[in-house]
Amino acid sequence: MPLAKDLLHPSPSEEKRKCKLKRLVQHPNSYFMDVKCPGCFKISTVFSHAQTVVACVGCATVLCQPTGGKAKLTDGCSFRKKQN
């Protein structure tokens, strides 16, 4: 009797929904990102799960606010994930 789903080759969407420890290959959910300030356009490196308020170095504008998990970016801020 064949299985209904392939356990060795799960789809990427299934893997993303699983807990970080129960994935086929374990990896964390957090990452570093470059955040561009909407006022002075300087780029700052911010941790995705920052636990403190992060302000811009140039103009002291708040870039992100901590929440229970991921940090919430301020409106107007753009970001991209840093590559390894």
From Swiss-Prot:
Its cofactor is Zn(2+). Component of the small ribosomal subunit. The ribosome is a large ribonucleoprotein complex responsible for the synthesis of proteins in the cell. Required for proper rRNA processing and maturation of 18S rRNAs. The gene is RPS27. Binds 1 zinc ion per subunit. It is found in: Cytoplasm. One of its GO terms (biological process) is translation. Component of the small ribosomal subunit. PROSITE patterns: RIBOSOMAL_S27E. HAMAP family: Ribosomal_eS27. GO terms for cellular component: cytoplasm; ribonucleoprotein complex; ribosome. It comes from the Eukaryota. It comes from Homarus americanus. Its main location: cytoplasm. GO terms for molecular function: structural constituent of ribosome; zinc ion binding. Keywords: Cytoplasm, Metal-binding, Ribonucleoprotein, Ribosomal protein, Zinc, Zinc-finger. This is Small ribosomal subunit protein eS27. InterPro entries: Ribosomal_eS27, Ribosomal_eS27_Zn-bd_dom_sf, Ribosomal_zn-bd. A zinc finger (C4-type) spans 37-59. Belongs to the eukaryotic ribosomal protein eS27 family.
